[in-house]
Amino acid sequence: MIVLGVDPGSLKTGYGVVQHHNGSFSVLAAGVIRLQAAWSHPERIGIICRELEQVIAEFQPERVALETAFLSHNVQAALKLGQVRGAVIGLVVRYALPIYEYAPREVKSAITGKGAATKEQVAFMVSRMLSLHTVPKPHDVTDALGIALCDILRGESRQSGVPPRTNSRRKSGTGGSWEQFVRQSPNVVVRS
């Protein structure tokens, strides 16, 4: 299975293409689309869509995972992020790909087991799960890879009938997708 994870932003949009095969993960592509603040917002959205379209055409993901919008006190920033998300969703729909959306807290919980994990903790676990020698920079890249990994883990839960783990305060050992991942991927999990 190949999943494209997208961490949308109006100045930086991270993307990561992750393949899951026989219980192991590999990165096919990852990067950040950097945009200039001086460019018009419609121009930036167009560039994001063109770049992501090239990624979709080259790697042909089976589905796309997108981070949901966060609550912002800056109305203009929230509107711009919503426009970027809408454009990405429109692009994905045009390719008839299924799209799944995940809140940042859900991604953190799926990757680290804690919904309140720091970006550094997420980046560390993403690099471990993907057997990377270094942590990808900037955080937009590791966030996008984490979103793709979250989708793969949640997809396994959907297929197996295990409910997704949405509340990070649940007691461990209750059968959430993180526990399932650990059981199914002994070669990926780092044990101390």
Curated annotation (Swiss-Prot):
Enzyme class: hydrolase
Catalytic activity: Endonucleolytic cleavage at a junction such as a reciprocal single-stranded crossover between two homologous DNA duplexes (Holliday junction)
Entry's cofactor comment: Binds 2 Mg(2+) ion per subunit.
Subcellular location: Cytoplasm
Enzyme Commission number: 3.1.21.10
Cofactor: Mg(2+)
Transmembrane annotation, as ranges: none
Biological process according to GO: DNA recombination; DNA repair
Positions with biased composition (Polar residues): 182-192
InterPro entries the record matches: RNaseH-like_sf, RNaseH_sf, X-over_junc_endoDNase_Mg_BS, X-over_junc_endoDNase_RuvC
Chain positions covered by the region annotation Disordered: 158-192
Gene Ontology MF terms: crossover junction DNA endonuclease activity; DNA binding; magnesium ion binding
Binding site for Mg(2+) 2: 67
Cytoplasm keyword on record: yes
Top-rank taxon, per record: Bacteria
Positions bound to Mg(2+) 1: 7, 140
First-listed, main subcellular location of the protein, grouped into a coarse class: cytoplasm
Keywords: Cytoplasm, DNA damage, DNA recombination, DNA repair, DNA-binding, Endonuclease, Hydrolase, Magnesium, Metal-binding, Nuclease
Subunit composition and interactions: Homodimer which binds Holliday junction (HJ) DNA. The HJ becomes 2-fold symmetrical on binding to RuvC with unstacked arms; it has a different conformation from HJ DNA in complex with RuvA. In the full resolvosome a probable DNA-RuvA(4)-RuvB(12)-RuvC(2) complex forms which resolves the HJ.
HAMAP family, alphabetized: RuvC
Function description: The RuvA-RuvB-RuvC complex processes Holliday junction (HJ) DNA during genetic recombination and DNA repair. Endonuclease that resolves HJ intermediates. Cleaves cruciform DNA by making single-stranded nicks across the HJ at symmetrical positions within the homologous arms, yielding a 5'-phosphate and a 3'-hydroxyl group; requires a central core of homology in the junction. The consensus cleavage sequence is 5'-(A/T)TT(C/G)-3'. Cleavage occurs on the 3'-side of the TT dinucleotide at the point of strand exchange.
Family of the protein in this entry: Belongs to the RuvC family.
Protein name, UniProt field: Crossover junction endodeoxyribonuclease RuvC
